[in-house]
Design a protein with these regions (language model features):
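Metal-dependent catalytic neighborhoods of phosphoester/phosphodiester hydrolases
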Residues: 71-77
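Metallo-beta-lactamase
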Residues: 34-40, 47-68, 75, 83-128, 134-193
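Short hydrophobic/aromatic-enriched beta-strand-loop microsegments
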Residues: 80-85, 150-152
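Structural motif
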Residues: 25-27, 59, 146-150
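Residues that act as N-cap/strand-start positions at coil-to-secondary-structure junctions
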Residues: 12-14, 112-114, 133-135
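Zn-dependent metallo-beta-lactamase
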Residues: 1-46, 174-177, 187-193
């Protein structure tokens, strides 16, 4: 089962993280933004990690390393954090205005770097979806109802996703599967425009 959890807002715009209840344990996709820092625009409003998100997760998967997606990583020292190698390298060597270095590299960070598609657990796979960042990845989850895509910021809206403007968007559209975006409360099967 996949569950969304509100993790931050900007000007009322929600940012969700997701939990995957897997037979091997709980997987957390992105960790939101649990507090603020002077480096951030005051329009960003952090949300404490929801009480219903357990801290004893099997692993974390970051779709990318922008602050609203990895800001809670430091709550999970020693827990494997799956990320594309390109994303981690870019966050460390070419940070942009959405990168908070101390939230990427923190005491106890246990990154597992991937170079392309990978299976994290049976039925939980990573798909590189470059566009929003060069190392962005989506998470593909096999459920009893079929494939579900956790798309992160592959697009900010389903309308944008439908344009297929980036390589990552085209990869997700080709799956024709229910897709969660980080800013959408519910999944939708995206349609090309």
């Amino acid at each position: 089962m996949i569950r969304p959890h509100l993790a931050a807002t900007v000007k009322g715009f929600p940012v969700y993280v997701h939990t995957i209840e897997h037979a091997d344990g709980l997987v957390l996709v992105d960790t939101g933004m649990i507090d603020s820092t002077p480096e951030l625009d005051e329009n960003w409003e952090p949300v404490p990690m929801p009480e219903n998100v357990p801290r004893d997760v099997l692993c974390v998967i970051n779709t990318h390393l922008h602050f609203d997606h990895c800001g809670g990583n430091r709550l999970f020292p020693g827990v494997p954090i799956h990320v594309q190698a390109r994303e981690l390298a870019d966050a460390r060597t070419e940070p942009d205005e959405h990168t908070v270095n101390s939230w990427v590299d923190f005491d106890g960070a246990a990154y597992v770097e991937h170079d392309g598609e990978a299976e994290v657990l049976p039925g939980v796979r990573l798909l590189p979806t470059p566009g929003h960042t060069r190392g962005h990845q989506a998470v593909l989850v096999d459920t009893p109802e079929g494939l579900v895509v956790l798309g992160g910021d592959v697009a900010y809206s389903f309308r944008e996703l439908g344009t297929g403007a980036t390589e990552g968007q085209r990869r997700v559209l080709a799956l024709a599967a229910p897709t969660w975006l980080a800013h959408a409360e519910r999944p939708k099967v995206p349609m090309p425009r």
